[in-house]
Amino acid sequence: MAFLKKSLFLVLFLGLVSLSICDEEKRQDEDDDDDDDEEKRGVFDIIKGAGKQLIARAMGKIAEKVGLNKDGN
């Protein structure tokens, strides 16, 4: 009976250790994914900002050609 208890405790202990290792790896993977998402957002923000500047410049040039000045006259 004592042998079965020790075996059972050993199996449960090893199961808990492997489970905690898997959880730790999962958390690391999630952190890596979060970093990738932040990088993607950073690149998207840069592209979006550049696009806004290009549109503003294009609208300014169009307004100049049409004859509108910055005051709206």
Swiss-Prot record:
Q: Where is the signal peptide?
A: 1-22
Question: Could you give one GO CC term from the UniProt record?
Answer: extracellular region
Principal localization reads secreted
Recorded protein name is Ocellatin-PT8
Which residues lie in the propeptide?
A: 23-39
Protein location = Secreted
Q: Which UniProt keywords apply?
A: Amphibian defense peptide, Antibiotic, Antimicrobial, Cleavage on pair of basic residues, Secreted, Signal
The yes or no answer to whether the keyword Lipoprotein is present is: no
Q: In which tissues is it expressed?
A: Expressed by the skin glands.
Family statement: Belongs to the frog skin active peptide (FSAP) family. Ocellatin subfamily.
GO process terms (BP):
defense response to bacterium
This chain's function reads: Has antibacterial activity against Gram-negative bacteria E.coli ATCC 25922 (MIC=60 uM), K.pneumoniae ATCC 700603 (MIC=240 uM) and S.choleraesuis ATCC 14028 (MIC=240 uM) and against Gram-positive bacterium S.aureus ATCC 29313 (MIC=240 uM). Shows no hemolytic activity and no cytotoxicity.
Pfam families found in the cross-reference section = FSAP_sig_propep (PF03032)
UniProt superkingdom:
Eukaryota
Under InterPro entries, the record lists: Frog_antimicrobial_propeptide, FSAP
